[in-house]
Swiss-Prot record:
Species in which this protein is naturally found: Cytophaga hutchinsonii (strain ATCC 33406 / DSM 1761 / CIP 103989 / NBRC 15051 / NCIMB 9469 / D465)
Keyword line: Ribonucleoprotein, Ribosomal protein, RNA-binding, rRNA-binding
Entry protein name: Small ribosomal subunit protein bS18
Gene this protein is translated from: rpsR
Gene3D superfamilies in alphabetical order: Ribosomal protein S18
Domain of life: Bacteria
InterPro entries the UniProt entry points to: Ribosomal_bS18 (IPR001648), Ribosomal_bS18_CS (IPR018275), Ribosomal_bS18_sf (IPR036870)
Pfam families on file: Ribosomal_S18
GO terms (BP aspect): translation
Tagged with keyword Disulfide bond: no
Family classification: Belongs to the bacterial ribosomal protein bS18 family.
Binding partners and assembly: Part of the 30S ribosomal subunit. Forms a tight heterodimer with protein bS6.
Molecular function (Gene Ontology), one example: structural constituent of ribosome
């Protein structure tokens, strides 16, 4: 195996976890844009579950919170560089 193959295998074998279940967070506050920026890419799109590692239940809550924050103007809908 080469060095590249070993690093790829390590990334693939890493166990993903839901940070909300681990920390015991039940409510995702849409009025906290700094927290919601962790789940949004540079263009303002919501990141998928496979990248963030959140469970389906909390991914739905995150997307709902991001959409609410966009609606009241705390997060932009589209931008060139958000981070």
């Amino acid at each position: 195996m080469t060095l590249q193959n070993e690093s790829i295998n390590r990334v693939e074998n890493r166990k993903k976890y839901c940070r909300f279940k681990k920390m015991g967070i039940f409510y995702i506050d849409y009025k906290d844009p700094n927290f919601l920026l962790k789940f949004v890419n540079e263009q303002g799109k919501i990141l998928p579950r496979r990248l963030t590692g959140t469970s389906l239940k909390y991914q739905r809550k995150v997307s709902q919170a991001v959409k609410r924050a966009r609606l009241i103007g705390l997060l932009p809908y589209v931008t060139d560089s958000l981070k």
